[in-house]
Amino acid sequence: MIDCAIIGGGPAGLSAGLYATRGGVKNAVLFEKGMPGGQITGSSEIENYPGVKEVVSGLDFMQPWQEQCFRFGLKHEMTAIQRVSKKGSHFVILAEDGKTFEAKSVIIATGGSPKRTGIKGESEYWGKGVSTCATCDGFFYKNKEVAVLGGGDTAVEEAIYLANICKKVYLIHRRDGFRCAPITLEHAKNNSKIEFLTPYVVEEIKGDASGVSSLSIKNTATNEKRELVVPGLFIFVGYDVNNAVLKQEDNSMLCECDEYGSIVVDFSMKTNVQGLFAAGDIRIFAPKQVVCAASDGATAALSVISYLEHH
């Protein structure tokens, strides 16, 4: 039987594996179908991880993690997981190929991904001017003009954040009304650096080999079209958490989740199910930063060590 099963191989999962194995967990297994690394491997530049002074790509950044985290005995099972369920005091893990595993404890570190819009040019310029993380990429646009797309809390909050760095922020939303907290909207409207463009949609993201150069936008009320010259577009139209592994045969969820499907945990990354932990972007209130996901993974592993000692 597996002592600790880790579902997901991003920064949270890898950190959990490192801390679990170094902490004496004899049989720790990481379940990740492909090479571990997580969605950060798709990032073109990382410069906000403490201790890493050079600007590196996400792929280069995560490569040493794999080597270090497997050095202490973490095993890698290259298979996708379909479902995790509880059977008595242990867990049953069903892989997509039908194979089953049993584990004393489980850390869910499956992460999530920002929703995409399908706008023409979005895929082409993803990571080359199109971003979903103002904290990660905002600094690259210091004293430049950028656009933010979205009408919820995250979009408006990130527009305010970017206004502290950028020369100007265009906040684009398809409706006149916003879904964010009124006080947040008020702060944005009182910020002279933020210009509201409503009701507008982005029809195309344009650019060249160096990245985004402009946006084609259209007013949905008047059909007026205009070109917005900006080197960056930040998209905040929602976030999908990868919680499918929690869904049971009767369609219930293995543990408590919030309205968005994120796993409810306490400060030690424990869920409401004994022996089940969660770390990284899958958990509630996740800051969605690599350094935070790594911290979560370490915390979850320490909680697992304590759990295994007493069970």
UniProtKB/Swiss-Prot annotation:
Stored InterPro entries: FAD/NAD-bd_sf, FAD/NAD-binding_dom, Ferredoxin-NADP_redctase_2, Pyr_nucl-diS_OxRdtase_2_AS, Thioredox_Rdtase
Gene3D superfamilies assigned: FAD/NAD(P)-binding domain
Binding residues for FAD: 31-39, 281-290
Cofactor: FAD
Catalysis performed (reactions): [thioredoxin]-dithiol + NADP(+) = [thioredoxin]-disulfide + NADPH + H(+)
Known EC number: 1.8.1.9
Superkingdom in the source lineage: Bacteria
GO molecular-function terms, A-Z: thioredoxin-disulfide reductase (NADPH) activity
GO cellular component: cytoplasm
PROSITE patterns: PYRIDINE_REDOX_2
Cofactor binding note of this UniProt entry: Binds 1 FAD per subunit.
Record keywords: Cytoplasm, Disulfide bond, FAD, Flavoprotein, NADP, Oxidoreductase, Redox-active center
Localization per record: Cytoplasm
Statement: the UniProt record of this protein carries the keyword Disulfide bond: yes
Subunit architecture: Homodimer.
Note: The active site is a redox-active disulfide bond.
NCBIfam families in the cross-refs: TRX_reduct (TIGR01292)
Family named by the database record: Belongs to the class-II pyridine nucleotide-disulfide oxidoreductase family.
Name this protein carries in UniProt: Thioredoxin reductase
Organism: Helicobacter pylori (strain J99 / ATCC 700824)
Lineage, uppermost ranks: Bacteria, Pseudomonadati, Campylobacterota, Epsilonproteobacteria, Campylobacterales
